[in-house]
Amino acid sequence: MIQGIHIHDFFSSGLPLIDVRSPGEFLRGHIPGAFNIPLFSDEERAQIGTLYTQLSAEKAMEKGLEFAEPKRQWYLDEACKAAPGGNVAVHCWRGGLRSRSFARHLGENGFKRIELIKGGYKAYRRQVLAYFENPLNLAIIGGYTGSGKTEILGTLASLGEQTIDLEGIACHKGSSFGAIGCGPQPTTEQFENNLFEAFRNVDSNRPVWLEDESHNIGGVNLPLPLWQQMQKSRTWFLRVPREMRAMRLVSGYAGFGPGVLTEAITRISRRLGLENSTKATRLVEGGLYFEAALIILGYYDKSYDRALSLHSRSNVIEIGVDSADQEINASLLIEYEKGRRTC
């Protein structure tokens, strides 16, 4: 039985989801957890589009049927892997001919419940972008590079706090060194989808802890409304001594070797200055990572000060700490956020 379902109802349905768009469309952005069973390859889709614009819809449809016919059994085999129970949701770009044709094929071959996402992926994207326009209950962890903000975020999660790791979702640590040890980044569109997935189940009555970030994290951008809300939210700025931060950076990066690290220094050499970049490079090549980290932190501290100036100053609360221990600092943040301590 084929029916239509709104995207917000799909989320609570528990149904497996099949995305029949082309591989390229899926790669640019998809609903997290969806299975891609493309009705057409990227090349086939391009050919059909050309026929549609240059000849007629009828010719385009004929070519689509020609491409699809040899793959009918493959569609079924893949759909059975994705939804072995015979219940499934299906979508294409706008909930049009591709998803309807695929759903009909499943219905004719034993699938029991088939839900078509109304409006398709386009409707989902509208919901994603609209979500970040809503007021969000955020608590921001601020601090200079090397303060251990990401580790503190993980500790907060283990203590039962609501957290979202923006850098983890972006697959980037947010600096010239940020790609080191990370996999490939998603597209900005997919990053937004993954963020929405992380946010949509949070309890809005409790704060969500985020790490303070620039508008861009590596090659992806935060949704502008989210980033603007972050600038206006409570920001707990942990002032950790520079030497402790340098030691943390050495612990996190020295293992990748001098070649990778000097490449990262080269990327910021203009901003670091010729003298500092040359000196830092030589120190790294000589294995003096701590001394190099102190030089690099001089640049990043100034850069962070400029970024911090974009925040609503009345919402930035500075906390001086004499430890880089994530357990201690996470517990301290909880006490401040819940009003058990005052600055």
Where are these regions (language model features)?
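Flexible, polar/low-complexity N-terminal or interdomain linker segments that lie immediately upstream
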Residues: M1-P32, A60, L129-E133, L138-G142, ...
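Positively charged, proline/Ser/Thr-rich regional signature most characteristic
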Residues: F11-A83
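Hydrophobic/aromatic beta-strand patches that form the interior of the parallel beta-sheet core
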Residues: I18, F35-I37, E115, A139, ...
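Catalytic cysteine-centered active loop of the rhodanese-like fold, especially the PTP/DSP P-loop
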Residues: E62-K118
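Glycine-rich phosphate-binding P-loop
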Residues: L97-R98, A139-S158
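Long, charge-dense
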Residues: R113-L129, V250, L261-A264
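Conserved nucleotide-sensing/catalytic segment adjacent to the nucleotide-binding pocket
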Residues: S158-Q229
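Conserved NTP phosphate-binding and transfer environment spanning the P-loop NTPase/kinase superfamily
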Residues: Q229-T235, R239-C343
